[in-house]
Structures are given as structure tokens and as C-alpha cells.
Amino acid sequence: MSHNDTIVAQATPPGRGGVGILRISGLKARDVAQEVLGKLPKPRYADYLPFKDVDGSALDQGIALWFPGPNSFTGEDVLELQGHGGPVILDLLLKRILTLPGVRIARPGEFSERAFLNDKLDLAQAEAIADLIDASSEQAARSALNSLQGAFSARVNHLVEALTHLRIYVEAAIDFPDEEIDFLSDGKIEAQLNGVIADLDAVRTEARQGSLLREGMKVVIAGRPNAGKSSLLNALAGREAAIVTDIAGTTRDVLREHIHIDGMPLHIIDTAGLRDASDEVERIGIERAWQEIEQADRVLFMVDGTTTDAVDPADIWPDFIARLPKNLPITVVRNKADITGETLGISEVNGHSLVRLSARTGEGVDVLRNHLKQSMGFDINMEGGFLARRRHLQALAEAAEHLEQGKAQLLGAWAGELLAEELRLAQQSLSEITGEFTSDDLLGRIFSSFCIGK
């Protein structure tokens, strides 16, 4: 498929609605207007017109908007037809447009891809369109809009510009080694480098916040049967999401709930009780539980407080702790405090957090909610934030690593050439975020996840 083709797609969700929009972009958009509307509308004015079939009969009537390139979303000629939102009407109109030569259905995300290729958006802004559509909370939506308006890109471009100036200074020091002043050791380059590193650290902190807003944290509730895992899921979700009985092994599959705590998304996963099971279905559920545990950001180790007084996870169930992935954060949740009479609250035991609560009555659950929020390092008061994806975090981490390596070369051996190379690699990593240095394969993966009409 060529980017020279004219593309068309429905820009509104499928199904019935008050309004249905078809978007056309490309060189043939002008021809589509002449054939379907009988005229070319005045640029950027709403024109109420009939939409005509091949034989001149009306298929529908509605609003036509004409945006001649390059002053359009894609940078190409764009025509939008806003008609009635019935699927049959829209399908007839779409088929009519596709009878014209050189016009085809758009691929997912192709409108945004063309906007990127025509320098109307950088890659981070294009991704923010999808993030804005997928936002699951008000704060995520606001942060996605900030990214779309260029907040994230501006921070990255500032770093790239600072690296460019630093590279010029370093290259000059390399090219003129006979100067009386040793530019590499006079402290100026080190000071500038430290400034860039500090700025990058600040961006990484904000990006981690943005990633939390977009991705959320995956929390798995695990423990023995009848410890109260499903009751805790229901308490956190605020609804009866899981069946709760006194029968051990009631939960046999993975149950997922998506919740928010002060705008922070959490993926709460209830799992089958862990034990040696003879039942084949339960055994499969237990294996799935372990798969979820291995991919978790945090495990809530659910303990029935009526069965043990132990508080150290290694004392409660050493085999379970031994099987957990290394460095996986654990929060011990001693349940049934309404029966044991334990004091509700949170404490620390050998480096692990311990929460005492009653999932059945809900007492102490707010303490757990606050603990989960704090464990993520989420700052609800951070203003002007932006959303970030995992690839953004990786690119920022790679840039930080190159800068640290460059600093080591500067201070350890005054190796200007090696410093210059590390600065170049850091700049390249940062430029991957906005798409200045990005492979075609990555572009394909990013835009293929978009809606068809975007």
C-alpha cells in the first residue's frame, strides 16, 4: 500500500448514532468532493449538501467540511462527510466513495501516520491521540491531552537541544587539541553534562508517573484457599465481582478488576487458592495463578489470621516465598481481624509491609488502598504531567546510561572521542521518542494499534 493513495474510513464508532463521519485524505479527496457533493466546499466552512450516488440520486444529506493541504490534520487534502449515523447509510456512502479510482480503505492509524510523516505531529504526539481515546480516568485524559499538545515532546526536545550544544563544545575541544586551554578538563563540559543529567532525571521521574497513569500497576492477590482473597477483591472493587463461599477452592480461574485510587489505575487480580490439588480444573487454575504472580508488580499475600499468629511471610509459608520471583514486592495481608481482634493498620516486618484488615466488613481496606498508592510512588499533586509508554521509559533509561558512561569517560580518562560518541547515542535514544530516529517496523507496530479512522 502506498502513501500516495487516497484513503477513506469511518471516523465515528460503528453502530447506530446521531451522526456518522467519513474521513477522506489524499490527492483524490478533491475528486471525491466533486463526485459525491457536486462541488468543492469552501475551505474550513460547514456546507449542508446532499451526498450523491453514482446515478445522481441522494444517499444522504449532511455537513461537508473541506480542509485543503497542508493546513489539515494529515497535511494532505482532507474531506469530512458528516451524515446520519445509521450503519447502512454509512456503508452505502463508503461503497460509493470506493468506486472512485485511487481510493482505498485506510489501515488502522493511517491518518495519524500520515500526520506524522508530513510533520504535523511528532511520534509522541501521535501516540497521545490513542492514549487520549483509551484514557480510563480524568487525570489520564488530561495528561494525554498535555502530551498531544506537545508537553512531553517539548521536554525531550529541550534535552536534545542541550545535548547538541554540548556535542558542539566537545567536538571543538577534540578538533583543536593544541589550544592553550584544555576544554575537556576546565570543568565547563562537566558542569553542562551534569545539568543535562539532572534535567533528564526530572523528565524520567515525570515519565514514570505518566506510565503509571497509562499502564497502571498489576496487583495479584495470592494465598491459600479460603484466606479471603475474593472478599478482598470485592472490597477493593466496591462490588460483588467474585463469588464468595466457605468452600475451599471456590475460585478456580483468574478474576480481573480494573479500579482507580485517586486517579491511579490498578489491575487487581484474584487467583485460585494455592495448594496441591487433585482436581484437574483447580490444578489448571493454580498454574494460571502462578503465571499471574510471576508477571505482577506487587503481590498481596493473603493470610487467614485465624490459622496462624505469624507475621513474617517466611514463617507463614516458606515454600510460597521461596517460589516467588526475586525482588517482587510483597504485602502481607492478615485477614479476618474482625474475628481475631487484631489492631487494624499497617506495619513493617523484616522489610515487608503488613496490613491487618477485615475483607468481609471492609475495616482496614482504606489503609491497604493508601498503601498501594504510596507503593507506586504516585504523586496526585503533580501538575502539567504527560502520559508515557514503556518504550519512552526505555529510551530515557538508555539515554541516561549513555550520559553516565560519557561522564565516566570524561572524568576517568578525559577521552573526548568516547564522550562524544556516548553523547551521540544518548541524543539518538531521545530522538526515538519523537520519531526523529525510528525504524519502520516500530512505526508499523505503533500505528497499527490505532482506530481505523485515526
From Swiss-Prot:
Family annotation (CDD domains): trmE, TrmE_N
Subcellular location(s) per record: Cytoplasm
Required co-factors: K(+)
Sites where the protein binds Mg(2+): S230, T251
GO MF, one annotated term: metal ion binding
Domain annotation TrmE-type G: ranges: 216-377
Residues reported in the UniProt entry to bind GTP: 226-231, 245-251, 270-273, 335-338, 358-360
Cofactor note: Binds 1 potassium ion per subunit.
Subunit structure: Homodimer. Heterotetramer of two MnmE and two MnmG subunits.
Record's protein name: tRNA modification GTPase MnmE
Taxonomy of the source species: Bacteria, Pseudomonadati, Pseudomonadota, Gammaproteobacteria, Enterobacterales
Name of the coding gene: mnmE
